[in-house]
Design a protein with these regions (language model features):
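C-terminal motif of bacterial Sec signal peptides marking the signal peptidase cleavage site
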Residues: 16-19
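Acidic/polar surface patches and capping/hinge elements
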Residues: 21-148
Length: 148
C-alpha cells in the first residue's frame, strides 16, 4: 500500500515534465528556393564579362554578331528563370513562332542560381565553339566558382 502512495506522485511529476517537452517533428521542412527576382544579378554580370573577354580575342570578331549573340544568350537566360517569377511572362506571348514550354515542376524547390549558371555554361560552349583550351577552361572555372 505504501508503494502505491509513492508511485502516483512520481508518475504525476514525470507526466508533467514530459508534457512540457516540445515534440520532435518527424517531417523536415522542404527546401524552398528564393524567387529569381530575389537573387543577385552577379551571375549574369560575370558570365557577360567572360563572354565579352573571350569573344573579342576570337578570330573573325565583329561587333554586330556579338550583340546579336548576347541578345540570344540573355533571352535564353530569361526563359530559364521565368517559371520561377510569378509576375513575369514568357516571351512566347510576345514573339510569333516562339516555342511555348510548359513547366510542370515545383518551382519552389529549384535553385535558380544553379539553373542559370548551368544554362550559361552550356550555352557558352555552343556560342564560343572555336575558343581555345584556355578560354574553355575559363568557362569551366567560372561555372565551378559560381557554385561555391
Amino acid at each position: 500500500m505504501k508503494l502505491h502512495f509513492r508511485f502516483w506522485p512520481l508518475a504525476a511529476i514525470l507526466l508533467t515534465l514530459a508534457s512540457c517537452l516540445e515534440p520532435e517533428d518527424p517531417i523536415q521542412e522542404l527546401y524552398s528556393a528564393p524567387s529569381p527576382t530575389q537573387v543577385s544579378n552577379d551571375i549574369t554580370w560575370e558570365w557577360s564579362e567572360l563572354y565579352l573577354k573571350i569573344e573579342r580575342n576570337l578570330a573573325g570578331f565583329r561587333p554586330a554578331p556579338t550583340c546579336r549573340a548576347m541578345a540570344y544568350i540573355h533571352m535564353g537566360a530569361y526563359e530559364t528563370v521565368v517559371p520561377g517569377m510569378e509576375q513575369y511572362r514568357s516571351l512566347a506571348q510576345a514573339i510569333n513562332g516562339f516555342p511555348t514550354i510548359q513547366f510542370k515542376g515545383d518551382t519552389t524547390r529549384i535553385n535558380w542560381a544553379i539553373a542559370l549558371n548551368a544554362y550559361y555554361a552550356r550555352t557558352f560552349t555552343f556560342f564560343l565553339f572555336n575558343a581555345n583550351a584556355a578560354e574553355q577552361s575559363s568557362i569551366e572555372q567560372l561555372e565551378a566558382t559560381q557554385l561555391e
